[in-house]
Amino acid sequence: MYGLINIGFGNVISGDRVIAIVNPESAPLKRLKDEAKDEGKLIDATYGRKTRAILITDSNHIILSAIQPETIAQRFKQSMIEIEENLNKVR
């Protein structure tokens, strides 16, 4: 239960759908990106900037972000903390 996560430049994704945040430099991930593009499952949220993170979703969509994977992971963590705090207020 993560809510919406900002992945840069006003783009947000459903945190619950993301299964991995990875660095795009390896050859297998470059192939994965190319395959997703061919299948119409590539979402480019970089606004023309260098891809610094690849997010893989449970629907096999590949999302490109210009934000570092560590930064996105920190945003996931912060989102989880905020949701936990809000749930504790309700309880």
From Swiss-Prot:
A Pfam family of this chain: RemA-like
Cited InterPro entries: RemA-like
Bridged cysteine pairs (disulfide): none
Domain of life: Bacteria
UniProt record similarity statement: Belongs to the RemA family.
Name of the protein: Putative regulatory protein Tlet_1629
UniProt source species: Pseudothermotoga lettingae (strain ATCC BAA-301 / DSM 14385 / NBRC 107922 / TMO) (Thermotoga lettingae)
